[in-house]
Amino acid sequence: MACCTATEAIRLPIEMSHQSEIIKGNEQIHSSKFFKDSKNGMFISFLSDDARTLYETFRRGSYESNNGPCLGWRDSVTSKYQWMTFNETLLKAKNFGCGLVNLGVRPHDLVGIYSSNRPEWTLFEQGAYCYSLVVVALYDTLGPDACAFIIKQTDMSTVIVEDDIKANMILDKAPHGLRRLITITDSIRSATITRAKNRGVDCFTFDEVERSGSKQDHPVVPPNPEDICTICYTSGTTGNPKGVTLTHQNVVAAMCAVLLQLGDQRPRYGDIMLSYLPLAHMLERCCENGIFYSGAAVGFSCGNIRNLTDDLRALKPTIMPAVPRLLNRVYDTLMSDLSGSPLRRLLYNTALKAKESELNRQIIRKNSIWDKLVFRKIQESFGGNLRLMIVGSAPLAGNVMTFMRCALSCIIVEGYGQTECTAPVSLTICGDSIPEHVGPPVACCCVKLVDVPEMEYFAIDNQGEVCVKGTNVFRGYYKDPERTAEVIDSFGWHHTGDVGMWLANGTLKIIDRRKHTFKLSQGEYIVPDKIEAIYVKSQYILQNFVYGESLKSGIVAIVVPDVDVLKSWAKENHIPGTLSVLCSHKKVKELILNDMLSWGKQNGLKSFEQVKDIYLHPDPFSIQNGLLTPMFKLKRPQIKNYFKPQLDDMYTHLP
């Protein structure tokens, strides 16, 4: 079928067969082709000399937009978006920062915020930078104990909270050093105010602090590039959370490197980005600050992920960050809809093939016959105006990536990064249609791979642990030199714990994890050792191996039952058979799975840390069968390979 309108292909910024430079030497260090000095081991720190801190980048954005719209919000899912201009935002932010100074907060103090995404988040952040304050974000999945630890470790005297519920959560375990709670909404109860006073904590509203700052001015104290702008706490491992210390230079370098690589597709005045991913994480923070720097606008979601489509239809964003969990849901919904209609599936497959052919020729448009017949509904569910999507936080399956590029008819780039690298390490090139890699290094860093002999990955084979050095790499974990030394070596390389490989075209592909910790598709970290240690408390379990994939949202386990306990239970319940027979019995599986989940709940495992399915295996892991080390530790890669059919089968049957 003929296309509606011919469209010119987008310009490829570099040669696709050679996407990164290799720095001279024998370490095979890869760097960006977008910054001419990268091949000499130098990295970008800024794009404009007058915009080297987040205080300055915001003001440059105000100039670029000519005081255009900056922050958008709506009060309900049925109302329209209303907007605050850059100048209005700057004034309110400065007044709020000044109000904090009136309360006794001083330059370089650490101030917390515990809130969902909303305009006040940005007003606080920019107000903090007016007086060189350090932003520390708290969030739900940290939990009360971790939040209390953070407040105590940072000597935090002031926390901005969204509402009465979050205020009380902070008060539940508030350290003695906490002096002030500032609530964004006016819904705080008098009982909460009394409770706070009994703990020596004063309560204020966001508006009160802003009004105070408008009446009593203080000269601004802008930060230097080397000053800390934020401490981003990550709960990715066992024990207390780690505070990733990031400077203004770190964040500006990271966002400028991404803007540089986006080239013709970078944000500009007139663009609108939907803010819905947590601002507590650096992916969203970098995206938003890059938008502001470009003079573009940010519209905030209403806060309920179930209403995301309503927000998208109302805002009609042109730019959107995304995570695999969201895109997987869109893909799975479509596949489910198509399963009952062979004719619709045929039409869809024909449309996808035609769009993919254009995609491979860098033709990206929304006006083909296939857009009108097949993909218009999906495009409109994202607002209809999307031109750029940035995917991060976890890997996206190749078939889902290709589908989204064809269906949304917009540029979709996929990045790889870590909080310790201020988010981006690498990013795919605009127009590269090949999925399942994460592109070349961005211009603020270089990347090398180092041997992981215990997993049989060697740099000489272009495989190994991903190590990063550059202006985006953090200075260390806050007040934690021991854990800092574990990940930053004496030469300044950050060891990510991820295992990657270089593809022939100079792009990076993440293939494994050196540490046992891994991420699920929704971005949550899993520590299998911790979960296994809880499950093995079950009387029915001799050994267990917890497994997950970064493209999946749940975990599964291989379980070796305790033969004596299980046979005793089977005898009492009149279930005959050998251990092998019992392992395949439905009631036995239900018994052990339910007991595991019960132990998990008793020991505080979160829902995403609980297994969704198990496979019972009669033979123990041992040194002799190659599944245990001489120190009787699990040989994870070997167990994964040994039980690959069973693991694949469990994931096939998960919802």
Language-model region placement:
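Conserved AMP-binding/adenylate-forming core of the ANL superfamily
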Residues: 46-50, 67, 71-126, 143-148, ...
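Gly/Ser/Thr-rich phosphate-binding loop
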Residues: 201-206, 318-321, 330-433, 446, ...
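Conserved AMP-binding/adenylation subdomain of ANL enzymes
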Residues: 252-275, 279-372, 385, 407
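Conserved AMP-binding A3 loop
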Residues: 83-87, 229-255
